[in-house]
């Protein structure tokens, strides 16, 4: 099994169309090179709970959910992808830095376990509704 952590659309630029193409190209290359199943062991992006936007802007709940949808489209197109593990279940504390004010916000739930929009999208995916 080939296991990869990838953050297209977050650490590697915010253009979701480019993220989708870059992710797919890379996963196809891994599949072609090794001929083994692929498990995406980490993927996602931060969202500040309650930060909403009519357009999908980085740090909003909409962007986080749309970013996950981008990854899921790629996973669903590629037979080589046999599993996925979104990063992360819930927001958590980290050392402060210019990219992490009050912790890591990649959780699909807040630190006190309130669901963000991404949690609802994942629920729909796992139930087969979306």
Q: Language-model features: where?
A:
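Substrate-binding/catalytic cleft of secreted carbohydrate-active enzymes
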Residues: 1-122
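Surface beta-strand/loop "capping" patches
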Residues: 124-130
């Amino acid at each position: 099994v080939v296991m990869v952590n990838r953050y297209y659309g977050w650490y590697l630029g915010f253009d979701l169309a480019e993220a989708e193409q870059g992710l797919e190209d890379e996963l196809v290359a891994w599949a072609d090179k090794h001929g083994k199943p692929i498990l995406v062991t980490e993927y996602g992006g931060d969202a500040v709970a309650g930060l909403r936007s009519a357009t999908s802007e980085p740090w909003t709940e909409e962007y986080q959910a749309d970013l996950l949808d981008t990854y899921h489209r790629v996973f669903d197109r590629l037979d080589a992808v046999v599993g996925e593990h979104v990063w992360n279940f819930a927001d958590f504390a980290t050392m402060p830095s210019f990219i992490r004010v009050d912790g890591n916000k990649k959780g699909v739930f807040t630190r006190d376990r309130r669901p963000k929009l991404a949690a609802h999208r994942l629920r729909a995916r796992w139930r087969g509704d979306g």
